[in-house]
Each structure stands twice: as C-alpha cells, then as structure tokens.
C-alpha cells in the first residue's frame, strides 16, 4: 500500500529552512495542484536548479553562526597571551636615593670627609683618565689600595683608571684592584724586560697611551705615580683643563731625604718660568715631573690638535736619559710655555707629593701571605 506523505505548510517550511532543520532533499516549494506537481516533476533541469539553490541557502545559514564565536575566542586568546607577556616585563625601579639625604645608609667605617671645592657646570661630563704604572714588590698592595681610596672619592666625575703592570699581570694585584670598586683596566707590558731595569717605565706609559689612542678616549689624561700622595683639589682642577696644564710637585729624595721642588712659576695662570733644585736639570727644556702635568687625550689621536704636525704618534721616549724623558714627552705636545696653563692661577699650591716608600725588591710573598718564620718566640704562660 502506497503511503501518502503530507507536505508541511508554507509557513512551517520557511521556519524549518531558516533554522537548518530541512535536509538537502526537502522541498521548499509550496503545495500545488497535482497538475502543477506533475509538471514540475516532469522537468528535471528545473528540479536540479531548485535543489542547488536549497543547498546554497542551507550552507550560508550554517556558516553564519560560528563567525561571532570564532571572533570572541580569538579576542579572548589574544588577551590571555598579552597578560602572560605583560607579567614578564621588568618592573619599574624605585626612586633613586638622593646622596645628600640624611636617611642614606651609613658606612660602619666612614672615610674622613674633605671639603670639596665648588665644581663647574661641566665637571660631570669630563672623563678623567688616570694612568698608574706598577710592578710586583712587597709594597704594591699598599700603593694600589691607597691610590684607589683617593680615586673612590671622585664619585661626581667619570673616571677610568688604567693600571699597567711591569711584566705579566699577577693574581695578587688583580685581586687587590677588584676589591677597590674603582672602574679600572689592568694590563701587562714589557714581558721581555726585567722589572728591576730602569727602562721599563716608558714601556708601561706607552702601553697606556696605546689604549687611549686605539679606543679614541676623550678626556683629561694624567700620569699618577703609585708612590704619590694626591689632594682632591688636584682632580677637581683637572676637569677644567682645556689643553695642557702644569703645576709644581715636591719630591722627597730617597738618598738625602731632601725635598726637591720642580714645576712652573706662574702669573695669572701663565707660565713665566721654572723652579728646579738640581743643577743638572737646567739642561732640560721643561722642568716638570711626570705627575706634574695633564693634557687633553684628544691630542694623542687628533692631528688637528697637535702642535707638531710632523709627529705621526705621540709616545713616551724610550731611548732618552731618564732625567730628560718627561721634558722630551712634553715637547711633543706643546711648542713653548705660551701653550701651557698653570693651575692654580698663581701655581702656589702643592696638590700632590712624590714620596717613595718601601723596599724595591721584586721578591714578595705569594698572595701576600707569609708561610715561614711564624714560630712562637714568646710562649704564653
């Protein structure tokens, strides 16, 4: 018995088609008369076209609803990813403490405070390049530590301390420099020269000049002997140097314990003469000590600032007599006293001393630790 399938009403068919409940073979045409139904079934081309139209409408309806969900989940995932990224960003640091504040941390071993002269507006932008030759000896740790304590007080100015070891760098000197907390560079030179020879010092100075020249360091270059005693006023005056400056330096003789004063005689900042004690030093062109002058480091690598354009490079003379080496080096920087400035204006202040101290023997305990001669001489009762 043939079953008779009743079609849905037109309103119900539209409702089912809108919500995708009709299958691909459901018809959306309204009921018609048998004559019209037979005519539609007899035309297969129109039926196929009508079936394709129904599939397109159903697919368009089924793909329309997931788009808002996809957009919502995409935005949610992006937001969660940004939260994970923001959680790994560096947190802002707290306010930088004011060094002049009364609530700063107090050092349990305070350093004696010295009155500082008023600094110039450009003092914070001038690099001080301090060159110190050193060699292995029992008093090396004492010299380097004392020099470092002086340089640590120059916290208001950029500083680079170049320490040049005669021979290979030693672990003892490197450890002593690391404890100073001063920005430094520790290098060795003249490995083939005996450290007790009198001609190793020019090689050390030239090694430091090579560093300044190769890296094009711009600042005030000063040769500070490790045996010297320095005032803070000296380093504050060094920041104001424009080209070349000099000042008098007293030196205590090791043999006679006499004070030898060498340096310029100035009038309103202009060098008008020289003061010297030894008669043999009168043969020199400039009567100054190696720790009694400073100059702009750009004179080493900028030919436009040199007084003698014929010099290819400015280096410390190595084949000149020791007493004439300082004057021969300065002759490469300036032509005469008119290109010098005396500091202070009248050159009447002593701002550093050259005081030799300690044994000159190159033998010293390894690690500065004594392992022998530690027997008990006076026992406890």
Curated annotation (Swiss-Prot):
Compositionally biased intervals (Low complexity): 26-46
Enzyme Commission code: 2.4.-.-
Lumenal side: 91-381
Molecular-function annotations in GO: galactosylgalactosylxylosylprotein 3-beta-glucuronosyltransferase activity; xylosyltransferase activity
Glycosylated position list: 194, 296
Membrane topology, as annotated: Single-pass type II membrane protein
Cystine connections: none
Annotated protein name in UniProt: Probable glucuronosyltransferase Os04g0103100
Organism: Oryza sativa subsp. japonica (Rice)
Gene encoding the protein: GT43H
């Amino acid at each position: 018995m043939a079953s008779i399938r009743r079609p849905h009403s037109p309103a119900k068919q539209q409702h089912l088609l809108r919500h995708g409940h009709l299958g691909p073979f459901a018809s959306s045409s309204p009921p018609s008369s048998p004559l019209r139904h037979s005519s539609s079934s007899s035309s297969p081309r129109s039926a196929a076209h009508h079936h394709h139209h129904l599939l397109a409408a159903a697919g368009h309806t089924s793909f329309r609803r997931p788009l808002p969900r996809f957009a919502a989940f995409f935005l949610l995932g992006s937001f969660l990813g940004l939260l994970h990224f923001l959680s790994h960003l560096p947190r802002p640091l707290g306010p930088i403490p004011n060094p002049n504040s009364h609530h700063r941390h107090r050092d349990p071993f305070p350093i004696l405070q010295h009155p500082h002269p008023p600094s110039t507006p450009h003092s914070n932008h001038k690099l001080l390049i301090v060159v110190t030759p050193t060699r292995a000896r029992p008093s090396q740790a004492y010299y380097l530590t004392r020099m470092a304590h002086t340089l640590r007080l120059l916290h208001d100015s950029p500083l680079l301390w170049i320490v040049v070891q005669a021979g290979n760098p030693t672990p003892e000197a490197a450890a002593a420099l690391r404890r100073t907390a001063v920005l430094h560079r520790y290098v060795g030179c003249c490995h083939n020269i005996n450290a007790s020879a009198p001609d190793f010092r020019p090689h050390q100075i030239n090694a430091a000049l090579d560093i300044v020249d190769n890296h094009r360091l711009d600042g005030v270059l000063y040769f500070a002997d490790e045996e010297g005693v320095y005032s803070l006023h000296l380093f504050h005056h060094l920041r104001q140097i424009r080209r070349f400056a000099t000042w008098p330096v007293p030196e205590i003789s090791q043999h006679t314990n006499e004070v030898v004063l060498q340096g310029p005689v100035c009038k309103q900042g202009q060098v008008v003469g020289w003061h010297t004690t030894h008669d043999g030093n009168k043969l020199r062109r400039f009567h100054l000590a190696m720790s009694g002058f400073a100059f702009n480091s750009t004179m080493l690598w900028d030919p436009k600032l040199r007084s003698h354009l014929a010099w290819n490079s400015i280096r410390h003379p190595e084949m000149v007599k020791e007493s004439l080496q300082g004057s021969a080096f300065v002759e490469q920087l300036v032509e005469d006293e008119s290109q010098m400035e005396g500091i202070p204006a009248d050159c009447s202040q002593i701002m550093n001393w050259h005081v030799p101290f300690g044994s000159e023997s190159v033998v010293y305990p390894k690690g500065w630790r004594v392992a022998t001669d530690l027997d008990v001489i006076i026992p406890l009762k």
